[in-house]
């Protein structure tokens, strides 16, 4: 069993929890979901998920509660993180917005709500490195990755813009993988990814 922590300030917490459980089941791994709203929870988690929502509000809570430094320590220990939409903004090296205190756990620069300036939401099939078939990605006022540094690997692009990246054991997407029954992004981040340490924390049932 693994313990999966989900930052539960905003965003689709229950949908992410269901996707993590489905991904674990595909590997015969049971998952306990814990919601993160205060410090002291992250150190006990094997994997972490930072969902969407309003990035300024989420980053303020992480800073105020001291959760930000716990997440950074989690990453330094080589433990997996999946950050989606606003989570990508918070995880980035630079969000180009002084209102957002970024975690600097993935080597990218992000433009907030870039797709939302033209269209509020859309779905597109994405070719994602590590997945055999296109992933049905749902974009909702999504950020754009302006630049990926040398430590970040681009996993998927949409109209020449990176929309999924990986930096060590951290995977981040501009889209919402939880808004589809397809749990392959959660699987890629937490179970199928050979660059993380989740395998040392699990036992099969």
From Swiss-Prot:
It holds the Pfam family SNO. The active site is at 85 (nucleophile), 176 (charge relay system), 178 (charge relay system). One of its GO terms (cellular component) is glutaminase complex. Keywords: Glutamine amidotransferase, Hydrolase, Lyase, Pyridoxal phosphate. Pathway: Cofactor biosynthesis; pyridoxal 5'-phosphate biosynthesis. It comes from the Archaea. L-glutamine binds at residues 53-55, 112, 140-141. GO terms for biological process: glutamine catabolic process; pyridoxal phosphate biosynthetic process; pyridoxine metabolic process. GO terms for molecular function: glutaminase activity; pyridoxal 5'-phosphate synthase (glutamine hydrolysing) activity. Its EC number is 4.3.3.6, 3.5.1.2. Catalyzes the hydrolysis of glutamine to glutamate and ammonia as part of the biosynthesis of pyridoxal 5'-phosphate. The resulting ammonia molecule is channeled to the active site of PdxS. In the presence of PdxS, forms a dodecamer of heterodimers. Only shows activity in the heterodimer. HAMAP family: PdxT. NCBIfam families: PLP_synth_Pdx2 (TIGR03800). Belongs to the glutaminase PdxT/SNO family. This is Pyridoxal 5'-phosphate synthase subunit PdxT. The lineage of its organism: Archaea, Methanobacteriati, Methanobacteriota, Stenosarchaea group, Halobacteria. The gene is pdxT.
């Amino acid at each position: 069993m693994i313990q999966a922590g989900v930052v539960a300030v905003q965003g689709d917490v229950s949908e992410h929890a269901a996707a993590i459980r489905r991904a674990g089941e595909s590997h015969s791994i049971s998952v306990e979901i814990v919601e993160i709203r205060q410090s002291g929870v992250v150190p006990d988690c094997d994997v972490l998920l930072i969902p969407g929502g309003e990035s300024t509000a989420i980053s303020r809570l992480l800073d105020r509660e001291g959760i930000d430094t716990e997440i950074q320590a989690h990453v330094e220990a080589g433990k997996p993180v999946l950050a989606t939409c606003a989570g990508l903004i918070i995880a980035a090296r630079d969000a180009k917005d002084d209102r957002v205190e970024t975690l600097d756990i993935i080597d990218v620069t992000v433009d907030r709500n870039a797709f939302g300036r033209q269209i509020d939401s859309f779905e597109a099939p994405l070719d994602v490195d590590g997945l055999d078939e296109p992933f049905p990605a749902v974009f909702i006022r999504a950020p754009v990755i302006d630049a990926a540094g040398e430590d970040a690997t681009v996993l998927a692009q949409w109209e020449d813009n990176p929309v999924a990246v990986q930096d060590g054991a951290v995977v981040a997407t501009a889209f919402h993988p939880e808004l589809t029954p397809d749990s392959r992004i959660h699987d890629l981040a937490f179970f199928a990814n050979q660059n993380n340490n989740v395998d040392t924390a699990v036992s099969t049932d």
